[in-house]
Amino acid sequence: MAQLRPKIVKLAKIIGGVTGITTKIDENAPEYYCMAGILSDDEADIAIAAGLRKERTAGYLAKKVGKTVEEIAPLLDNLVYYGIFRRSMDKALGEDVYYMQIFAPGILEMMVNQKELLETHPEVGRAFEEYTRNLAANMGAMIPDGYGLMRVIPVESALEGIEGVSDYERISHYLDKYDRFSVSPCSCRASRSSLGDGCGHLEEDMCVQMGRGAEHYIRTGRAREITREQALEIIQRAEENGLMHDMVNIEEPGESAAICNCCACACFGLRVGLMFGARDAIRSNYVAEVDEAKCVACGQCVETCPGNALKLGQKLCSTEDLTPQPDYVKLSETIHPKRSWNPDYREDHEDVMPTGTAPCKTACPAHVPVQGYLKLAAQGRYTDALELIKKENPFPAVCGRICNKRCETECTRGAVDEAVAIDEVKRFIADHDQHEATRFVPKLCNQIGRPYTEKIAVIGAGPAGMSCTYYLANKGYPVTVFDRNPVPGGMLTLGIPNFRLEKDVLTAEIDILREMGVEFRCGVEVGRDITIEQLRAQGYKGFYVAIGAQKSARLGVAGEELTGVYGGVDFLRAVNLGEQPAVGKRCAVIGGGNVAMDVCRSAVRLGADETYVLYRRSEAELPADPEEVKEAMEEGVRFRFLTAPVEILGADGKVTGIRVERMALGEPDEKGRRKPVGTGEFETIALDSVIGAIGQTVDWGTLDTSALTTTKRGTAEADALTYQTAQPDIFVGGDCYTGPKFAIDAIAAGKEAAISLHRFVHPGQTLTAGRDRRVYRALDKEHVLLETAGFDKDHRQMPGYNAAKAKTFSDARVTFTEEQVKKECARCLGCGATKVDSYLCIGCGLCTTKCKFDAIHLKKVRDWHAGSYETMPIKVAEGVVKRAGSIVKKAVRK
């Protein structure tokens, strides 16, 4: 073990400032090991001579260490390069001056921001994280209100219309005050990335330096010079990407060297409050307030809030207490500071109040903000509504026609009369994407304002693959989609008949992906035509495998090899490719799901006079959408319930009929459904064709799955949150992971995979830190008090029907009119609203930038401001006394 170096110990004590006096320094102390492997004793002597936070000339320092200016010049250059000194030109003196700041904020940031130094001395990144963590743990309880070394400064647009705003609370004050600016990587994120602990918020072009700080950063290559206008652009882009602002808080009010664009999951300054409970030290003078009359619980503010102060709740009256007071252990009121700590603050973000929120948003697998887009549609703001929907679902026109509408199933209005026709409204909104003049194409949205260069391959152009593609392309990634089929869309194109999803509707939404820069390579089977290894060699950094479950499950009865027997998915694929599968005059479809409904209705359109659906359970257990069942019955399809195939009969190699057994319902199976059992009663039905639609399996084809593990069902195994497989650069999703589900499930999974891939392709990022788990819970409708007397009594609007298209391959359903949309949106009860926890709110104002409804604003509630670092010892002493008094008062009250 290397011997402890006294000069480095002494220097560490000096730089430690207020805490350096009492801190024990040994070889394991971050303030020691960050310098011990870098500084020489001669360099340490010069730094010691400089003292803390004093501007010194080279002549002064040379005299103090007994050397000439020429002798110490290279040592000064080294100290500046390391980040121990800040160098800037003193215009009055006409020469450079040297300034030694405290460790943090100060020296450690500058050390980390010297990229070459961080690469050659990775202990610097570790020291920054450890030092700031130790400092917060030891000093957090003693920091006076508003005296955090870093402090939140609100988004300036959030201050509009507020009286009593001080100049130093406005970002524009600093941009106007200084005349030189630079931008550097975020040092906190760079530190975390060096430790493999990044949160997906990248460090490039994040921290804006001003004045002498900018001069130093520019001269030492830590940052690039920018204009005032570019600084503002970076700040605004940070806000667009969900980042708030923090500033160095150790000078007099209105003085600062930098504006940081921070995230809660990486920033060491915010950690003082979010992990160690000292929120009063870091919060601004403002708190968020929600106007519940305007709030529609869209959740945009909630997902952005760095302090987790905003949660989705309800605004319907209830027999439950909807405002339970959290049992906080406040730092200012406890003698045991650790009780107020939250070591899991990067993992435990909650989106919803314990009492729940709007059932529609909760029930949707993608958590689409239904209440929000209904309100926008009611106001005629259709483009805004489309934009809001696409934050969670990039294919609303598709889903407006084929979704299984779990939002409507759970709609609170259904307890009064009928659920709101949510899907029909969505279809009306989304049809704006069918026209170039009205469609919504999102603009590039990432932290650097230009495309990333990391190439990503998506294998499978179905709903999961295209959803992942949309969100990656929106972030600026070059994405190539490979699909072995001749056209993109997967099951949306080839597994759903045109009378339910007309292909021009899907094509319009796929064309938006092309406009976003996505390349489709159809007719290319990965594994046969090109391998993943070859794609890696071409520079692809990540892969999303979403090939679906596109193989029909076998019936498992004799006669399946006969001509005239089809698998349901194979049959639909042929129909959608323009083929005419021979069904004859009599056709039986085996199964009871939505695929079976699509198949039987397609058979009717292909000329079958008698079409049967044979289902082994009763009508009550039929899993298909009731609307589709009704439409099939109206088209003449005959349903035979409690009927199971035993053998397919044939002659000369062709189907002639099917032998079936009458079933009865027995005891419930493991899923709670009553299991069908044979009765011994048999029947023969004369047929020309049999189509099995009892399920689908994954066909991995020639794709090399040796690096993946699969389940007994043949689906891929992967992490349930991140979708990462055993092969680190391969992620999976959609039906090839879950088994057959609905398009909206695949769409939701695709977005999560995009989040994972973004993190994966950038070194040093974790897949989970700071990630929103999106755990939703619905309000308890049993406790809701609905005052129905004042309700609009309009019944649910019904879509029109074009009889001329009946039994054709065109969609006979007619989209709502604008008048119908307005009437239907008025039926929404507006169940949800955002709730603010004023104790957790740090007053950043970021929430106000996300709200399209003018429902959330900042309010000034205090007037705290710090002085210079040199005043802190006195303020700390005052704070300790004040805290002791609070603890005593609380004890007396008890």
Question: Where are the language model's segments positioned?
Answer:
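FAD-site-proximal beta/loop scaffold in flavoenzymes
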Residues: 561-585, 668-740
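Ferredoxin-like iron-sulfur electron-transfer modules
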Residues: 37, 67, 246-259, 275-304, ...
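Glycine-rich dinucleotide-binding loop and its adjacent helix/turn
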Residues: 429-450, 508-528, 552-606, 710-726
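Beta1-alpha1 glycine-rich phosphate/pyrophosphate-binding loop at the start
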Residues: 368-371, 377-378, 419-423, 458-526, ...
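A conserved FAD-binding loop/helix module that cradles the flavin
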Residues: 599, 736-764
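A short, conserved structural fragment
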Residues: 80-91, 310-311, 856
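Short, amphipathic alpha-helical interaction segments positioned at domain boundaries
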Residues: 94-132, 878
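Flanking helices and flexible, charged tails adjoining ferredoxin-like Fe-S electron-transfer domains
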Residues: 307-361, 374, 420-422, 426-455, ...
